[in-house]
Amino acid sequence: MIKIYDTMTRSLQDFIPLNEGKVNMYVCGPTVYNYIHIGNARSVVAFDTIRRYFEYCGYQVNYISNFTDVDDKIIKGAAEAGMDTKSFSDKFISAFMEDVAALGVKPATKNPRVIDYMDEIIDFVKVLVDKEFAYEANGDVYFRVSKSHHYAKLANKTLEDLEIGASGRVDGEGEIKENPLDFALWKSAKSGEVSWESPWGKGRPGWHIECSVMATEILGDTIDIHGGGADLEFPHHTNEIAQSEAKTGKTFANYWMHNGFVNVDNEKMSKSLGNFITVHDMLKSVDGQVIRFFLATQQYRKPVNFTEKAVHDAEVNLKYLKNTFNLPIQENANDEELEQFVKAFQGAMDDDFNTANGITVIFEMAKWINSGHYTSRVKETFAELLEIFGIVFQEEVLDADIESLIEQRQEARANRDFATADRIRDELAKQGIKLLDTKDGVRWTRD
């Protein structure tokens, strides 16, 4: 049985879906005002891998990941670029789709956009106002945190803890909010900004309400899994829970999953430190599969440390797996141990999707394959396990002239003409073909 570390309970929980054989997942997507950075990619890749493992286990997955296309940063960026907000966000949605495709990420079942759910957002806020979970003040609408009895349980905090922390804060909204912790559901329009008509005047939604509306509209009042980066635990996911459960009276999500950060040379990635790395730029020099494989080297909840060496190691290891995949089939080989590797891999992934341990099993399997156990059945299974990590290798086909050289070398060796055999081997090496003589015949890999 798959076990998931649930942030809400701070413990491993058996995964029991709402509907047998089906999984509903909602993962917070990007705010589309710039190219995604490697930290954003960690979340995308982690939850794509989790989705793929569910599908490998036979589940039908309804995977929803949104685009936040109404936001202060988008308004600011569009104004600086001299573009309207939709054209500006469209540009970075397209860039996002290109980047994640290069990382081998499967398309989501649906990528909802905030601008397509404005009526539903307004209706959601109206219900909260009617139930007195929210109040209007000067054209803004705020959620009344004091009515949410388990507010911030997800972040393992109490309302009292948060109120103490907020007591020294002063902001422009402080005078009109009942409580410093109350958060905006609807923001009144400012001059020159994009806005929509509402019962409280022209305005636009707050960030947190957007995900609650899209998740419940598409997946229903209660969903199986809600995921995102660890930075979203508070306040974003905390506020999603408060407003969603206030509206429906039901548990919003049964499992909360949060992925760890990406550090750069053991430092937090930030623009101020100058170590901010976008996937768009990284793809100019590093293959997308290498980036993805690097991100999978740690279990999704743990931080990943980005270094040039770590990426290089991922490239070398991926090349080894590719060369293993392209070994010649030996149908008469003994493959009885195959099920042991599959069982070990599933054990690793069932334990809260431990990709690090899963990859260890894959390398043990590759070593076993290289020792002469590569049947068609083994190759098919090897490919299935790699695909869970988004790794798909193409069959390597040698040019006819290279195949001819390999055959000529075999003839030279058979005739004990080792000088000719060595010359052909060196010639092939210059073309990137490395030969390995084994008791079962010659093998080749592309260097």
UniProtKB/Swiss-Prot annotation:
Cofactor(s) it depends on: Zn(2+)
Cofactor note as given: Binds 1 zinc ion per subunit.
What are the alphabetically sorted keywords of the record? Aminoacyl-tRNA synthetase, ATP-binding, Cytoplasm, Ligase, Metal-binding, Nucleotide-binding, Protein biosynthesis, Zinc
Q: Where is this motif: 'HIGH' region?
A: 30-40
Listed binding positions for Zn(2+) are 28, 211, 236, 240
Isomerase in keyword set: no
Cited Gene3D superfamilies: Anticodon-binding domain of a subclass of class I aminoacyl-tRNA synthetases, HUPs
Root EC class: ligase
Q: Which family does it belong to?
A: Belongs to the class-I aminoacyl-tRNA synthetase family.
Residues spanned by motif 'KMSKS' region: 268-272
Molecular function (Gene Ontology), one example: cysteine-tRNA ligase activity
Q: Does the keyword Endoplasmic reticulum apply?
A: no
Q: Which GO terms describe its biological process?
A: cysteinyl-tRNA aminoacylation
Per the UniProt record, which EC number(s) apply here?
A: 6.1.1.16
Self-association and partners: Monomer.
Q: Which GO terms describe its cellular component?
A: cytosol
Cystines in this chain: none
Q: What is its main location?
A: cytoplasm
NCBIfam families named among the record's database cross-references: cysS
Q: Where does this protein hold ATP?
A: 271
Q: Which reaction does it catalyse?
A: tRNA(Cys) + L-cysteine + ATP = L-cysteinyl-tRNA(Cys) + AMP + diphosphate
Q: Corresponding gene?
A: cysS
Superkingdom? Bacteria
What is this protein called in UniProt? Cysteine--tRNA ligase
Q: Where in the cell is it found?
A: Cytoplasm
